[in-house]
């Protein structure tokens, strides 16, 4: 696994969690909204006795459990990446990698926080990635 791929694992998982949160919001809206009546003629052999919103409530419960598990996994991956970043010797490079891959800051935000120009910050980031790949197995 490339160093960049290893470092991006928390970011990817965080995006998946955010997508699940959006999906959870849709399910919550659907569980509160009335369903439209069906005017077509149909004769179910096994009538459904559950209210229409119950299936959305079940999906909400399942999704909330998945999100909780994903947060636990995200913490584990962040700890693993944080320990791997310690391999880099330069503290400024470590700081750049932590801002980027553990706090999910954008390049302009990192450059503002570190009081560097964006161009210099990108150069330091490339150098930090090279140092990380040399030290990480």
Predicted regions and their residues:
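N-terminal positioning helix adjacent to the helix-turn-helix/winged-helix DNA-binding module
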Residues: 77-80, 91-93, 124
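Short alpha-helical "recognition helix" segments of helix-turn-helix
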Residues: 109-114
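N-terminal interaction/assembly modules
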Residues: 1-87, 134-137
């Amino acid at each position: 696994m490339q160093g960049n791929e290893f470092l991006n694992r928390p970011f990817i998982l965080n995006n998946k969690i955010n997508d699940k949160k959006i999906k959870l919001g849709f399910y919550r809206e659907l569980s509160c909204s009335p369903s439209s009546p069906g005017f077509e003629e149909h004769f179910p052999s096994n009538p459904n006795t559950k209210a229409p919103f119950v299936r959305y409530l079940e999906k909400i419960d399942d999704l909330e459990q998945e999100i909780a598990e994903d947060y636990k996994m995200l913490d584990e991956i962040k700890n693993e990446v944080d320990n791997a970043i310690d391999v880099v010797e330069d503290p400024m490079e470590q700081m750049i990698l932590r801002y980027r891959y553990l706090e999910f800051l954008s390049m302009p935000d990192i450059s503002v926080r570190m009081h560097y120009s964006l161009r210099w910050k990108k150069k330091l980031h490339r150098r930090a990635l090279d140092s990380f790949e040399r030290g990480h197995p």
